[in-house]
């Protein structure tokens, strides 16, 4: 494969796991836009910067030289030489990342970082196939009911299912402006499917 594949979807739709597996099968790097937004949220929390302070947050990100290391097996985010990756999937980051991702300046900053990576690659996020890589050769949008997505996330986090579902519904409401399928994307409800089945479905469409 020599082009770009985009895999978009709401939170906990399985897009990250699918994108990693698809990238590995194709032998190309995997790009996670969400990891950059999470890094911005984490750094804002750690530095005491208001997540809604666009100017202050951009100054922080540029000053730390935040960058994404794209690899087929997963991504890492570095800031001033420090690997932040293990700090980015926490309930605290979950609760502020949507506010950070709504800032136009931060979205532009993330998009610049992503566009620095030469194709081929598999990119996952919420608007990869619409705002970032509209020229992608293959576009997919994965979704599932809020209940299914909350159940998946609760298995990964030390949180009760009910709390995860509440957080997820709030995030869906905040993210709905950014999270919509491209007109030419293939849409798949993954609720009744295994990871292997979703990966096989995506690969089958790419290899047609």
Swiss-Prot record:
Q: What is its main location?
A: cytoplasm
Gene Ontology biological-process annotations: pyrimidine nucleotide metabolic process
Does the keyword Cell wall biogenesis/degradation feature in the UniProt annotation? no
In its keyword annotation, does this UniProt entry include Nucleotide-binding? yes
User: Where in the cell does this protein reside?
Assistant: Cytoplasm
User: Which EC class does it fall in?
Assistant: transferase
Pfam families in the cross-refs:
Cytidylate_kin
Q: Which reaction does it catalyse?
A: CMP + ATP = CDP + ADP; dCMP + ATP = dCDP + ADP
- Single annotated GO MF: ATP binding
Which residues bind ATP per the record? 9-17
Q: Which UniProt keywords apply?
A: ATP-binding, Cytoplasm, Kinase, Nucleotide-binding, Transferase
Q: Which InterPro entries match?
A: Cytidylate_kin, Cytidylate_kinase_dom, P-loop_NTPase
Q: What's in the GO CC field?
A: cytoplasm
EC numbers? 2.7.4.25
By sequence similarity, the record places it as follows: Belongs to the cytidylate kinase family. Type 1 subfamily.
HAMAP family per record: Cytidyl_kinase_type1
Entry protein name: Cytidylate kinase
